[in-house]
Amino acid sequence: MAIQLVGRKAGMTRIFTEDGVSVPVTVIEVEPNRVTQVKTAETDGYQAVQVTVGSRRSSRVNKAAAGHYAKANVEAGRGLWEFRLAGDEKEINVGDELTVADFESIQMVDVTGQSKGKGFQGAIKRHNFSMQDATHGNSLSHRAPGSIGQCQTPGRVWKGKKMAGHMGAAQVTTQSLEVVRVDTERNLILVKGAVPGAVNGDVILQSAVKAR
């Protein structure tokens, strides 16, 4: 797996091409990702890199985390993220910083984030079911899901049946987004289109799996 970066969704805007075409873009701020730990097959059974980003007051860091950051001689961040390594990446050491400059040669990215929570929703909104008749004798079942199973055989509702429930607030990955611009001076990456999550939410970027 290629190097991944943790960023923050700053919002959306648009830019214009030389031909005057308006391109909607999402601005992702990628502060330097500080490496707190490098895991190897010999010591941990697999290859991975652990990073942190941002900052956090010392009073908000527990003793275990404070010791972990101190061992790596890295400033405490707002969280820890771990990414698997394939072994063919550049050499990464504890204390190194991964920046947007590592993505200058990448044209397509996959962006992972937590989708906006919608609370408890019905089957129509949650699963895009069709509504039932508004009239013609239908009085109470306009937005009902309809049948949820068979008869005495199997005599139960199948696992995974699409029904009403909590919608959103789940990990979502949008694949193969075009990288429109990389601003190394301001630590920004502009990608074409929308990415999951709300403004100021954490997102993870990696080179597009289907474009490698």
UniProtKB/Swiss-Prot annotation:
Q: Which Gene3D superfamilies match?
A: 3.30.160.810, Translation factors
The GO annotation for biological process reads: translation
N5-methylglutamine modification sites are Q152
What GO cellular-component annotations does this UniProt entry give?
cytosolic large ribosomal subunit
Role played: One of the primary rRNA binding proteins, it binds directly near the 3'-end of the 23S rRNA, where it nucleates assembly of the 50S subunit.
Q: Which Gene Ontology molecular-function terms are recorded?
A: rRNA binding; structural constituent of ribosome
Family in the record: Belongs to the universal ribosomal protein uL3 family.
The protein's name: Large ribosomal subunit protein uL3
**Keyword annotations for this protein?**
Methylation, Ribonucleoprotein, Ribosomal protein, RNA-binding, rRNA-binding
Q: What gene codes for this chain? A: rplC
What is the recorded post-translational modification?
A: Methylated by PrmB.
